[in-house]
Amino acid sequence: MVRGPSAIISLAAIVLGTACGHHAPAGKLSIAAAADLQFALAAGAQQFREKNPQTELAINYGSSGNFSTQIRNGAPFDIYLSADIQYPRALARDGLTAGSVFTYATGKIAVWVTNSSKLDPATALRDPAVRRIAIANPQHAPYGRAAEAALHSLGIYESVEKKLVLGENISQTLQFIQSGAADTGIVALSLALAPSLRGQGRYWQIPASAYPKIEQGGVIVKDSAAARQFRLWLLSPSGQALLREYGFSPADE
């Protein structure tokens, strides 16, 4: 793996509110969220707090697989929002959750290049001038598995395999491209569409037929009225509309 400088976008946790090492008390939620949700949930947290001012949110962003392992080891999260629904399903089967698993969105992927690059994002993966291509680590990042599948589907995996650099999660993958550690890469469409990044780069959306459906699922790990309220908001028309703004397909599609 290529190790870049500290990620501009959180590698381990970006906290909205005050994080703690114990289970969150009533009115405070500790959320483990897939890195592709960073910008969408930042906007969503503000929307949620306006309607639920009594609830404090502490949102941690990282790879879905790593969060699943942490929950198995007793990490004090109240809600788990994974980029791959299979992780929360496995936790639920093993009796490690307090609620049923729910689908909250379907993710999409895109090739991204910085505005300073001369590469065309639609052809960048095949460009012989490209030396490094960033993707998330397929071993524990669902978007990495989708990227790997897309490279196979596009018929170019073998020709680019030695160019691949692996990010710990999809946010670090984007940071590799931003920093120049990679010439281009495959990121979550939700990151490419973030308002703060629209002026920094260009993207080409990879056809959904090129990779398995990225069904994103969540589950309440520790039951509380606040956790149930957050789940209701996320699946509500306003929550789903916000996710759509960031390139996700709604849960019911």
Model-derived features with residue positions:
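Bacterial N-terminal signal peptides
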Residues: 8-18
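Bacterial N-terminal signal peptides that target proteins for export
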Residues: 1-9
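Exported/periplasmic ABC-transporter solute-binding proteins
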Residues: 20-52, 56-61, 65, 69-73, ...
